[in-house]
Every structure is written in C-alpha cells, then in structure tokens.
C-alpha cells in the first residue's frame, strides 16, 4: 500500500477549501462519479450503522430545481457539476428489533452488536428518539467530512451546504425517492479560481496536549 508523504498530505489539506463557485463547463466522468460514490459508501460510522442514503444528482434540471430552494447558495449549486444530497435514516429505522438493523449485520457480529446498541439506547439516550435522531445526524456529518476530503484527494472541489429549505428540496426529490429526510447538501465540481489562504485558529487555541 502506498501512502502520500508528509509534505504532500499537508499540501492537500491546505488546498482543500469550501468552493463558492465552480467551473460550470466541467463535467464529471463516470469513473469520477463512481469513485465519489464509493468514497461516500465507505464512510465510517458508530456501530457501522451507516444511517444514511446518498443521492447523487447529476441531472442539470433537477439540480437547478434544488438550487432554487437553497437561498444564497443558488448560483453556486447551479455552477456545480454534481450535487450530493445526504439523506439520514429515521430514528425508528435504527431500533434494534427493526428490519434495517436486523438485516444490516451478519452473525455472529449481529447479536453482540445489537445487544450493545440496545444498551446504548438505554444508558446514553434513555430511549429518546430525539437523541437518537441527533446521533444519526452525527454519523451523516462524519460521512460528509470523508466525502469532502476524498474529493480533494481526487483534485476536485466541494462545498458543504446547510442553507436550504429542507421541505422544498424534499418535495423536489420525493417525485423520485420515497419521503427523503435531508441532512445536508454537498456541491461538487472544479474551482474556477484559486482559494484564498486558509484561515484557522492557532494551534494553541485549537489543540490541548495532555
């Protein structure tokens, strides 16, 4: 297995940025789209619950319909080559005795994992569906981070979008997907200009060593 050296890793991490405008003439190859989809699919999650569904939007008309309900992100989404709609599963789908969880794992992993997960629902969440929903969103955001970093490693760009009307976007997608519950959007494409210098808190404000 080959790894990037430290200098290259640092360069890629610094070059990754939230791209606010994409090259509207750039078109993803089928290989690029498949690779992005696989990056998403392989994302880690607590208990390997994978409580998500990724909708890869490449249809321009559909993408623009979504953009129309994305407030100040409209122009940026319209310029993107593709849009990932990150949908979260509903809390009821993660109940240990439900169809999804019962069919997610193979034995003997299933029995011990579902037992441990049920204990977590009791001890950490006190069987609160609201807390379970927050847990599901946490897992989705882990996947979002992996997608954005993975796309950067491909030499491409992304922008995480939280500013959109979830109900309206859901209505657009509901014509093709049954009752989607949307966590966030990720615009994908190729930048039209170089990013400004990355701005982050100094190390001593961001990190504590013990």
From Swiss-Prot:
SUPFAM superfamilies: FMN-dependent nitroreductase-like. Keywords: NADP, Oxidoreductase. One of its GO terms (molecular function) is oxidoreductase activity. Gene3D superfamilies: NADH Oxidase (3.40.109.10). Coiled coil: none annotated. The keyword Signal does not apply. Its EC number is 1.-.-.-. NADP(+) binds at residues 150-155. The keyword Oxidoreductase applies. Pfam families: Nitroreductase (PF00881). Belongs to the nitroreductase family. Reduction of a variety of nitroaromatic compounds using NADPH as source of reducing equivalents; two electrons are transferred. PANTHER family: NAD(P)H NITROREDUCTASE YDGI-RELATED (PTHR43673), NADH DEHYDROGENASE_NAD(P)H NITROREDUCTASE XCC3605-RELATED (PTHR43673:SF10). This is Oxygen-insensitive NADPH nitroreductase. It comes from Helicobacter acinonychis (strain Sheeba). The gene is rdxA.
